[in-house]
Amino acid sequence: MSFIDSLATLGQYLPAVTKPKEKPSLGQKLVWSLVAVIIYLIMASTPLYGITSASFFKNLILEQIIFASTTGTLAQLGIGPIITAGLIMQILAGSKLISIDLNDPDDRVKFTEAQKGLAFIFILVESALFGYVLARTSTTINASILFIAGIVIAQLIVATYLILLLDELIQKGWGLGSGVSLFILAGVMKIMFWDMFGIASVSSQNLPIGFFPALFTALASHSDVLNLIVNTSTKNLFQPDLVGLVTTIALIIITIYLTTMTIEIPVTSQKLRGIRRTIPLNFLYVSSIPVIFVAVLGSDIQLFASLASYVSPSASNILNTVSGVFFFPPPNSAIPHSIYAVVLDPLGALEYAVVFIVLSILFGILWVDVAGLDPATQAQQLVEAGIEIPGVRNNPKIIEGILARYIYPLAFFSSIIVGLIAVFATLLGAYGTGIGILLAVTIAIQYYSLLAYERSLEMYPLLKRLIGE
């Protein structure tokens, strides 16, 4: 039995959500999607039993955004195992390391089951790792560490598998889009909402954490509002300010514009001679993948540095030094997370920007090659679909050369652009981080298109017959 067959067999034995017998209406899909989000948000607000704090993972902010996780809660792992399994399977399929034809319905089913099986394995492994670390560092219960770890691990396994089922519920047609996208969007919007409107008072100045409540409180009490324009406080490092708010709005507008830009390649169809159309290549060809990989790499090095402190302090110091270049301001530093940090540490800001953008370019080019987005794969798909480029022989090698003129420059420049968006968001203190903004905008645009599509099908039933639904 092959590797993918073994994973698919495991996936088949796991509890699953069945497909609806009849296609739900748009209203029903919206209700199920809302229910899934509410359950996720409840889990993200429910503390793990046996854990008093989760300060050990407090600095893994970017991972929490990417994986829609919340430290110290039932959503500690979030969608991390699902995304990790999905990326690995996509890389294996795109690089032809596994023999599978995603155009074959049976192989697609096998691929989906294998991905689910791999996600479950990651759930077990990550639950064991995080559960043990949390039990060792974040509890005051008078019991053995192994006993507490067992309780925490059990909670993480059940809760994370429930998140997997919620994702499956939406993907199988009960809801809209995918649960993974929906939970990321909900997580980023939650962070942005609290940065703008949070009323909890956590600062040394006794101001609410949200910008607008803090501004109202400061004006009403005739307090100094300069720190709310640009946060220069070394006591309240994470207080959102006006510069961050303006940056957030500007980056959202820029990201929407860039996300909707396309490069059109004229083509014709062998079946429909004389009819010309175009194939759009997204200007942000690699989407937010490069910055996600950079953020995950930095967070993982930081996590391993923390874990290594129990085994080898010297190794931990080395890893902490390496991970420091992935974050600005550096973790555990007394520098406010605002544009003022650039004034205090300009060399650190420059080092962070250079490292982040260079790695974004490397990951962007690598992703194109391993995920099947390269010119050779795209050319082969065009030939198999009977699509031709006018004035060019229908030869995969020739078409590959033409596509290479577009794809690699797009991959290079889009990697730089998403890297710059992430860097400027960090340096200027944008709400939700640059990666969060990129993910939220991309997902929101996808849902807008999906809602328009579903609405069109309901308004014009004839379209269902034309597209075979």
Curated annotation (Swiss-Prot):
GO terms for cellular component: plasma membrane. This is Protein translocase subunit SecY. Residues 60-67, 68-79, 80-88 dip into the membrane without crossing it. Its main location: membrane. Belongs to the SecY/SEC61-alpha family. Keywords: Cell membrane, Membrane, Protein transport, Translocation, Transmembrane, Transmembrane helix, Transport. The chain crosses the membrane at residues 21-47, 60-88, 110-131, 147-171, 179-197, 241-262, 288-309, 348-367, 411-429, 433-447. Component of the Sec protein translocase complex. Heterotrimer consisting of alpha (SecY), beta (SecG) and gamma (SecE) subunits. The heterotrimers can form oligomers, although 1 heterotrimer is thought to be able to translocate proteins. Interacts with the ribosome. May interact with SecDF, and other proteins may be involved. Pfam families: Plug_translocon (PF10559), SecY (PF00344). It is found in: Cell membrane. InterPro entries: SecY (IPR026593), SecY/SEC61-alpha (IPR002208), SecY_CS (IPR030659), SecY_dom_sf (IPR023201), Translocon_Sec61/SecY_plug_dom (IPR019561). It comes from the Archaea. One of its GO terms (molecular function) is protein transmembrane transporter activity. The central subunit of the protein translocation channel SecYEG. Consists of two halves formed by TMs 1-5 and 6-10. These two domains form a lateral gate at the front which open onto the bilayer between TMs 2 and 7, and are clamped together by SecE at the back. The channel is closed by both a pore ring composed of hydrophobic SecY resides and a short helix (helix 2A) on the extracellular side of the membrane which forms a plug. The plug probably moves laterally to allow the channel to open. The ring and the pore may move independently. Residues 48-59, 132-146, 198-240, 310-347, 430-432 are extracellular. GO terms for biological process: SRP-dependent cotranslational protein targeting to membrane, translocation. It is a multi-pass membrane protein. It comes from Saccharolobus solfataricus (strain ATCC 35092 / DSM 1617 / JCM 11322 / P2). Residues 1-20, 89-109, 172-178, 263-287, 368-410, 448-469 are cytoplasmic. The gene is secY.
